[in-house]
């Protein structure tokens, strides 16, 4: 299973990369805005840190505009993946970019059928949002299971990125279902490494070591 980090905070990306956990990065306009920096500057710096897929999102709502933006983004670095919204115009742009050999990530997916449409349009990645579904009392992980079944049934090559991850349980369930990727906030990555028995075990080892004659 691959781990992407879901942030535009370059410091967090460096820290996660140093842990050996980052296979790629997902960003969006909201995350870029939080950085307070120019969009292109942030993306360029990220590509210097992580040698893997870097999702950068278009802001146009019409396919023609998305395709124009995608062309500019793709020039930044070979690892740029164009993030497109799950709309009819987004699907149109996805199909066109796929024909041009540009990788795409169709985002804001909330149903298995949306994921199926994105796969049929040739999306490199599909990004279902589990946390936001949980927020409205729907089964976020359930749609991941359904998408995985559909893709396996028909041999779609689009990779499933479990997005809107809120806690370690989301990551665990994504792994158990067999999702290709989870895109995870840095804070949740750190939680994955923690357990109170690990902490108490380290404390006990250190205490025992202090009693060893020196």
UniProtKB/Swiss-Prot annotation:
GO terms for cellular component: cytoplasm. It is found in: Cytoplasm. Its main location: cytoplasm. Transmembrane segments: none annotated. The active site is at 83 (schiff-base intermediate with substrate). Keywords: Cytoplasm, Pentose shunt, Schiff base, Transferase. This is Probable transaldolase. The lineage of its organism: Bacteria, Pseudomonadati, Thermodesulfobacteriota, Desulfuromonadia, Geobacterales. The gene is tal.
